[in-house]
């Protein structure tokens, strides 16, 4: 008898943003296969005896290849087990959920997709940036700044895709990405923001114009989301989230920085 695999989106970082359906299937799973960006606290929802498989990918470290992950999901499903594949954000937004679903479908293993809150909308929201706003932004596009294998994305054909651009996986190429967007036609003076570790106590927001970010020496650690467009200008008025985590050794709360000014 075949089991079932749940492809569950874990949300952008705060474990409380997991959906009720996601929590429900986690609490009765036999196996949880989790990514690096899935909040570690969510593993505590799984039964104590559940198998936990680390499938995380980080710079210079890959616990399991995508092919190995697919094999684990198919193998456990064929054994009749309930499996949760726990992914940061949403499984179908740059999460390779489609690849895993195809592998399961091809093997005849039942699966269910449990959507999650994607950083593509949550990161801007936690920085006080609406991706659409009447009179400012009638459209938004979500783009990966980095392709498979770490190759840079071709931003020339996507730079004008929408009023608001949301670029995921941009942390390690921030200056290059901003420079490419300007070269592709985005206004150098357009408001832009980088949101790192969105929704967590370590959240950091850096604001400026595209040109300022392109010329700055600011560094952010992944996961980070770059947002650019007219509605980013609302961040100063709509900022609502106050991270509580202190900067190591300073006792100062992590906050928002402007690349041309001091912390607010």
Question: What are the residue ranges of the model-derived segments?
Answer:
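Short, acidic/turn-prone active-site loops that include or flank metal/cofactor-
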Residues: 12, 37-39, 55-62, 117-119, ...
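Short hydrophobic/aromatic-enriched beta-strand-loop microsegments
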Residues: 50-57, 108-112, 131-138, 185-194
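A contiguous loop/helix-start segment that scaffolds small-molecule binding in enzyme catalytic cores
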Residues: 2-5, 78-83, 96, 139, ...
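Phosphate- and divalent-cation-binding pockets in alpha/beta enzyme and binding domains
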Residues: 41-42, 95, 121-122, 176-177
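Class I SAM-dependent methyltransferase SAM-binding "motif I" and its flanking Rossmann-like core
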Residues: 14, 88-161, 204-207, 253, ...
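Class I S-adenosyl-L-methionine
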Residues: 1-15, 20-114, 214, 219, ...
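Short, glycine/charged-enriched secondary-structure capping and boundary segments
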Residues: 21-23, 46-49, 68-69, 98-102, ...
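Short beta-strand/turn micro-motifs composed of small residues
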Residues: 34, 87, 115, 144, ...
């Amino acid at each position: 008898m075949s089991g079932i695999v749940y492809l569950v989106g874990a949300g952008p970082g705060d474990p409380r943003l997991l959906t009720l359906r996601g929590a429900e299937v986690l609490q009765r799973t036999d196996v949880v296969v989790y990514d690096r960006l899935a909040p570690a606290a969510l593993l505590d929802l799984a039964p104590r005896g559940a198998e936990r498989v680390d499938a995380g990918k980080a710079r210079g470290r890959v616990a399991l290849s995508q092919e190995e992950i697919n094999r684990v999901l198919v193998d456990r499903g064929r054994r009749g087990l309930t499996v949760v594949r726990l992914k940061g954000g949403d499984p179908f937004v740059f999460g390779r959920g489609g690849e895993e679903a195809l592998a399961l479908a091809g093997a005849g293993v039942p699966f269910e997709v449990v959507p999650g809150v994607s950083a593509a909308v949550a990161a801007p929201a936690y920085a006080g940036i609406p991706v659409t706003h009447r009179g400012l932004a009638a459209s938004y596009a979500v783009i990966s700044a980095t392709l498979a294998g770490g190759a840079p994305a071709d931003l020339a054909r996507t730079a004008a895709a929408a009023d608001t651009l949301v670029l995921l996986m941009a942390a390690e190429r921030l200056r290059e990405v901003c420079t490419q967007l300007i070269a592709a036609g985005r206004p150098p003076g357009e408001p832009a923001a980088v949101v790192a570790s969105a929704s967590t106590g370590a959240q950091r927001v850096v604001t400026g114009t595209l040109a300022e970010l392109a010329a700055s020496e600011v560094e952010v650690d992944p996961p980070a989301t770059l947002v650019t467009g007219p509605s980013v200008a609302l961040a100063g008025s709509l900022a609502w989230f106050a991270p509580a985590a202190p900067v190591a050794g300073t006792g100062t709360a992590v906050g928002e920085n402007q690349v041309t000014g001091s912390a607010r």
